[in-house]
Amino acid sequence: MTNIRKTHPLMKIVNNAFIDLPTPSNISSWWNFGSLLGICLILQILTGLFLAMHYTSDTMTAFSSVTHICRDVNYGWIIRYMHANGASMFFICLFMHIGRGLYYGSYTFLETWNIGVILLLATMATAFMGYVLPWGQMSFWGATVITNLLSAIPYIGTNLVEWIWGGFSVDKATLTRFFAFHFILPFIIAALAMVHLLFLHETGSNNPTGIPSDTDKIPFHPYYTIKDILGAMLLILVLMLLVLFMPDLLGDPDNYTPANPLNTPPHIKPEWYFLFAYAILRSIPNKLGGVLALVLSILILTLVPFLHTSKQRSMMFRPISQCMFWILAADLLTLTWIGGQPVEHPYIIIGQLASIMYFLIILVMMPAASTIENNLLKW
């Protein structure tokens, strides 16, 4: 009798993806973040579903409905803070996952990489719209500032912004549609994640050496299932430490003040995971230029596979490229810090230099480093 796991139409898909999947024997903990992202997504959908049962997407009651969730709903506070801090964990895993892809040359799987970039954009859109829903000061002004950026688009800009707002300012219509989109997008992300996985399983996983590992594969279960469970336990540990001991560490105190269109907060800034892009946006004095730089700061990832000049796939044996990679990581941390600072000297010039460095490293310095390494190896 054949195993039902290998014959049943549905079980067969699960089996080939998570049980009998041939996996490189040497993939490190950097390969854990894919499964952690899946866990984050499931966690966000579940906590979000329970929050949506009590939330009202009306400007008059949105803020008080969130207060009601925290004060009156059974374990509402933990659901709310798991959702808010779950988003932070999601982005930490995302950045680690992308960093792994850049370091080990995983971007040469073109379809997988490009769907990953689309997933990043969709997740950023979802997180932005979710931040608007509590209808605090930073929710309102963040929504106003970020949607207003579209007015920089020539000719159609103003009409486009008013169309998104559903009126002449961020108001009831905006909040309602943001709630609708915030609810539907995670399911689109889940579908895209399945396509992401589908394309990955066409080629098989990369590994730290960047050398094809067809001659040395092991089954995913039990080796990597147990490894993923360890990763998941660590993820949940960090998340629960945040939720139970410092739930507001990564939030903005301004969001505990109800939205007031007549009172602008002194420093409008998004959540920490958008600060690097926000710093790039602010570092260009021209509005349209800033918006283009903001969009390109993410879309530049689609160019990375075409800028790969090295004869080796991974950076494991390329010290100069490794140096460039870690300079890029430090530059992104600098941009994140600058994004949270007021627009004044010396932060302006630091932000401008860090923004130039960001594009310079990816577009010029990394390909140049690869070429130098090729020549040093006489390839």
From Swiss-Prot:
Note whether Metal-binding occurs among the keywords.
yes
A GO molecular function term, named singly, is: ubiquinol-cytochrome-c reductase activity
User: What are the alphabetically sorted keywords of the record?
Assistant: Electron transport, Heme, Iron, Membrane, Metal-binding, Mitochondrion, Mitochondrion inner membrane, Respiratory chain, Transmembrane, Transmembrane helix, Transport, Ubiquinone
Subcellular localization(s) per the UniProt record: Mitochondrion inner membrane
In this chain, heme b b562 is annotated as bound at: 83, 182
Short name of one Pfam family for this protein? Cytochrom_B_C
**Can you quote a single GO CC term?**
respiratory chain complex III
Return the InterPro entries for the record. Cyt_b/b6_C, Cyt_b/b6_C_sf, Cyt_b/b6_N, Cytb/b6-like_sf, Cytochrome_b, Cytochrome_b_C_euk/bac, Cytochrome_b_N_euk/bac, Di-haem_cyt_TM
Tell me the residue numbers annotated for binding a ubiquinone. 201
Q: Where are the transmembrane segments?
A: 33-53, 77-98, 113-133, 178-198, 226-246, 288-308, 320-340, 347-367
GO BP terms: namely: mitochondrial electron transport, ubiquinol to cytochrome c
Show the PROSITE patterns listed in the entry. Answer: CYTB_CTER, CYTB_NTER
Query: Quick one: where is this thing mainly located?
Result: mitochondrion
Q: How does it sit in the membrane?
A: Multi-pass membrane protein
Q: Answer whether the UniProt record assigns the keyword Ligase to this protein.
A: no
The record's free-text note on cofactor binding: Binds 2 heme b groups non-covalently.
Record: residues binding heme b b566 = 97, 196
What cofactors are annotated for this protein? heme b
The function of this protein is: Component of the ubiquinol-cytochrome c reductase complex (complex III or cytochrome b-c1 complex) that is part of the mitochondrial respiratory chain. The b-c1 complex mediates electron transfer from ubiquinol to cytochrome c. Contributes to the generation of a proton gradient across the mitochondrial membrane that is then used for ATP synthesis.
Q: Which family does it belong to?
A: Belongs to the cytochrome b family.
Q: What else is known?
A: Heme 1 (or BL or b562) is low-potential and absorbs at about 562 nm, and heme 2 (or BH or b566) is high-potential and absorbs at about 566 nm.
How does it associate, per the subunit comment? The cytochrome bc1 complex contains 11 subunits: 3 respiratory subunits (MT-CYB, CYC1 and UQCRFS1), 2 core proteins (UQCRC1 and UQCRC2) and 6 low-molecular weight proteins (UQCRH/QCR6, UQCRB/QCR7, UQCRQ/QCR8, UQCR10/QCR9, UQCR11/QCR10 and a cleavage product of UQCRFS1). This cytochrome bc1 complex then forms a dimer.
Q: What is this protein called?
A: Cytochrome b
Q: Which organism is it from?
A: Hemitragus jemlahicus
According to the entry, what is the taxonomic lineage of the organism? Eukaryota, Metazoa, Chordata, Craniata, Vertebrata
